[in-house]
Amino acid sequence: MEPFFDGGTGRLRAPWRLLLQYLTYKILVPLLANLLAVAWVLAFARESGLSGAPVVRSLPDSPLLPLIGGVAGLVGVVLSVWLAGRFLDRRPFVDFGLHLSGGWWLDLLFGMALGALLMTAVFLIQLGLGWITLTGSFESFLPGAPFWLAVLLPAAVFLCVGFYEELLSRGYQLRNAAEGLNLPGVNPRGAVVLAWVLSSAFFGYLHTSNPNATPLSTAFVALAGLMLGFGYVLTGELSIPIGIHVTWNFFQGAVFGFPVSGLRIGGATFLSLDQGGPDLWTGGGFGPEGGLLGAGAMAAGILFTALWVRLRRGEVTVHAPIAEGPKPAYRPSHPPEGRQ
């Protein structure tokens, strides 16, 4: 068997496509982040009248740093997936789960509602058990900015992260892994399920360097990957995963004031709190995603996603076309009648 190219299509095999896309993404994101940081430094220095050096020294503490990272991640993932789709996968960009029909947007709204409700349940359970103490509300962490303006910062960051992480982990990685695993003896649905599990495990691994990460938090983030990927596995679209991801993070960090995978995005928060209770259940410094309550919410998210898909489509089944290669472009073998 040819190790690099598929003899039938001439495309690179799935492992090489995955590797090249990921390397492109890892090169583009820091490059774009540095370019955005330089642009911000120059603009701020010009507006403030300060020299570049003091502004550069203040950059690591700037509340805009998460936004720079979010925008760089968004552009880097979109560009790397588009390039890989165009030149490696040979499939249109929309085939990575972005067929923006009316039903797509309805599924997105469902996902957003579900992510908000799941995190609200985690908060209310902890509040009822006395594991959190509220210390403030409607707090802005941007100097001189009112709350309504400051809260746009985490909203923008979580919109970027929710979109680009789903496009990367589910839209590109899960799809290509499923195609690569669609081998003799493994039916297409089985390949999709295997790819779902493997891509979720890799999603957990990607969070191992986050602050306060533990082996347990890594396992639970992998479970979050299963929850987020479930809607994609059932529909072949990213609408439900993106919706859940955006509001899960926003309500976790900007509404209830929890850490999000160990990170504090800043900007503003509707509520501020002191975290108590057992770390095993709450996730401690990693946030709810690292605790049993968060894991329970993820399991509930899988259940509610299945119920929604059953309601919308009449059945709950793995979307086998995820494991299929792109359809060949139609090229007529002879000119139409009446034309030379």
Q: What do the PLM-derived regions correspond to, one by one?
A:
Residues 1-93, 97-100, 104-105, 252-340:
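N-terminal, membrane-interfacial amphipathic/helix-forming hydrophobic leader that caps
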Residues 71-76, 148-155, 168, 219-223:
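Membrane-embedded alpha-helical segments of multi-pass membrane proteins
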Residues 112-128, 159, 163:
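Mid-bilayer segments of alpha-helical transmembrane spans in multi-pass integral membrane proteins
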Residues 119, 189-208, 221-222:
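Small-polar-interrupted transmembrane alpha-helices in polytopic inner-membrane proteins
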Residues 159-160, 206-215:
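Membrane-interface helix caps and helix-loop-helix hairpins in membrane proteins
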Residues 164-198, 230-237:
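Membrane-interface helix/loop boundary segments of multi-pass membrane proteins
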Residues 176, 218-231:
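Hydrophobic alpha-helical segments embedded in the membrane of multi-pass proteins
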